[in-house]
């Protein structure tokens, strides 16, 4: 066999690979696996930009995948389901607990509704999982329901009477009283599988009241990348202790009525600053720093600061 010339750079990588795949069989198996993955449809990528701290709107966009979930419902049921029922199913997937509370008020036979709904969710779940390998789907499954969900969404040619097999699993779920929790789990799994990767483009922070909640949500997200915006950089600078960034963050938070982000979101006491401002600038109209929120919001914030200052003065005189 002829000697193959290998430069040092490539040799380093080959040595690393030889530790991961020490035999021809293991290397071949991995090549086959990767080639199979390349032949699967590309996972859905979701782009969101300029979130600006609006947590409720951002959360809703994540739940529906900017229409990706509704499209899957259309793909699965087509003309077999009318628009109203599709919209109701979509809402259930986005907000399962809240929707079920509303259903209970009008539905006389909840057990029947549970069974029908579970069948629908399983069909949607099969479709959204079809882009991925079994291994990837398995990793996305919640541990306590992993086996049952995998049984329901995986084709089993060895099972001759599939309908009876699925029906027995669903009936048992309803009889055990776990149907509601199972519906929540399936709904969240559909949300999870509908979007393979999230791209967040710029300005998580700014005017909205929930950027810290958005960051918490992103920390739990399965796959994402972030392109930071100028407002995000300012908050990073403030966290790092830069005086100019700190002043800008406080100024913006006050002008847009979002001091709760600083005080409740990050636990920073703003009362000393409010006390100083009320003393030092009590006769200054500060026209260059007027509120940009609605007048009622500005009045509420000013009232809160005044009450805090009054309480502080009362405490000092005791």
Which sequence ranges carry the predicted segments?
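N-terminal low-complexity, Ser/Thr- and acidic-residue-enriched intrinsically disordered segments
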Residues: 6, 19-130, 303
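A short acidic-Thr-Gly-centered motif at the start of a beta-strand
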Residues: 30-42, 187-197, 210-220
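Divalent metal-coordination and catalytic microenvironments
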Residues: 50, 203, 230
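Active-site environment of divalent metal-dependent phosphoester hydrolases
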Residues: 54-55, 206-209, 231-236
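Short secondary-structure boundary/capping segments
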Residues: 61-67, 214-218, 239-250
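Conserved small/polar residues in nucleotide/adenosyl-binding loops
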Residues: 310-317
């Amino acid at each position: 066999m002829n000697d193959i010339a290998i430069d040092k750079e490539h040799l380093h990588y080959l040595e690393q690979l030889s530790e991961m795949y020490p035999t021809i069989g293991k290397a071949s198996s991995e090549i086959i696996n990767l080639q199979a993955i390349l032949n699967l449809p590309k996972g859905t990528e979701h782009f969101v930009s300029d979130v600006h701290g609006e947590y409720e709107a951002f959360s809703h966009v994540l739940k529906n995948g900017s229409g990706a979930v509704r499209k899957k419902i259309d793909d699965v049921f087509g003309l077999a389901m009318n628009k109203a029922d599709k919209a109701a199913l979509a809402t259930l997937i986005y907000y399962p607990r809240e929707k079920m509370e509303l259903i209970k008020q009008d539905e006389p036979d909840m057990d029947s509704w549970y069974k029908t709904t579970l069948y629908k969710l399983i069909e949607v779940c099969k479709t959204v999982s079809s882009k991925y390998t079994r291994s990837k789907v398995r990793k996305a499954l919640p541990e306590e329901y992993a086996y049952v969900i995998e049984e329901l969404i995986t084709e089993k040619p060895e099972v001759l009477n599939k309908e009876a097999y699925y029906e027995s699993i669903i009936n048992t779920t309803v009889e055990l009283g776990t149907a509601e929790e199972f519906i929540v789990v399936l709904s969240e799994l559909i949300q999870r599988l509908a979007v393979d990767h999230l791209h967040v483009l710029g300005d998580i922070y700014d005017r909205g009241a929930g950027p810290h909640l958005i960051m918490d949500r992103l920390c739990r997200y399965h796959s994402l990348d972030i392109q930071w915006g100028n407002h995000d950089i300012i908050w990073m600078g403030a966290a790092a202790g830069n005086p100019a960034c700190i002043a800008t963050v406080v100024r913006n938070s006050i002008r847009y009525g979002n001091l709760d982000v600083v005080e409740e979101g990050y636990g920073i006491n703003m009362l000393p600053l409010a006390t100083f401002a009320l003393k030092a600038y009590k006769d200054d109209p500060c026209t260059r720093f007027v509120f940009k929120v609605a007048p009622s919001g500005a009045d509420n914030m000013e009232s809160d600061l005044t009450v805090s200052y009054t309480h502080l003065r009362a405490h000092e005189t005791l």
